[in-house]
C-alpha cells in the first residue's frame, strides 16, 4: 500500500505517485484487480525511504536490504531499469553510483545475502546501472 498523502500514514515518498502512474493492473485468481508497481519504481521508493526515514543507516535499514534483494533476485533488473522512464533510470543510476562509492555499503553488503558468492553479481549489476549516471 502506498500513501500519496503524508496525512494518511504520516509519511510519503516522492516516487509513490510516479510509481502508481506507471503501475500495471493485475487481476487476482478470485477476481479483484490490484495495481502493481514495476521493480525499478519499487527500487526508487526503497532508495528514497533509505535516504529519508532510514537516515542512511547502512547496517539496520530494511529498505536497503529490500533494495539489495531486488538487485540480487531479479536477473533482468538491469534491462528493466534501462527500459524505464528517464527520471527513474537516472535516479537509480545515481543511487547505484553512490552505493558503490560508499565503504559502509560495501562492508555490509555480504550481510544482505545468504551466499557471499552473490556479492560480485550484485556489485556488477549496480556498476552497470551506475553506468547510466549523469
List each model region and its residues.
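Compositionally biased terminal segments of proteins
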Residues: 1-134
Amino acid at each position: 500500500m502506498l500513501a500519496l498523502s503524508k496525512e494518511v500514514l504520516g509519511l510519503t515518498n516522492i516516487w509513490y505517485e510516479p510509481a502508481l502512474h506507471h503501475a500495471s493492473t493485475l487481476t487476482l485468481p478470485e477476481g479483484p484487480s490490484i495495481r502493481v508497481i514495476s521493480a525499478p519504481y519499487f527500487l526508487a521508493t526503497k532508495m528514497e525511504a533509505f535516504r529519508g526515514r532510514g537516515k542512511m543507516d547502512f547496517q539496520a535499514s530494511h529498505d536497503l536490504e529490500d533494495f539489495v534483494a531486488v538487485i540480487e533476485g531479479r536477473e533482468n533488473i538491469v534491462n528493466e531499469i534501462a527500459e524505464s522512464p528517464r527520471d527513474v533510470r537516472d535516479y537509480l543510476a545515481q543511487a547505484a553510483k553512490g552505493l558503490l562509492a560508499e565503504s559502509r555499503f560495501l562492508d555490509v553488503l555480504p550481510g544482505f545475502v545468504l551466499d557471499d558468492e552473490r556479492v560480485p553479481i550484485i556489485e556488477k549489476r549496480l556498476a552497470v546501472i551506475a553506468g547510466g549516471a549523469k
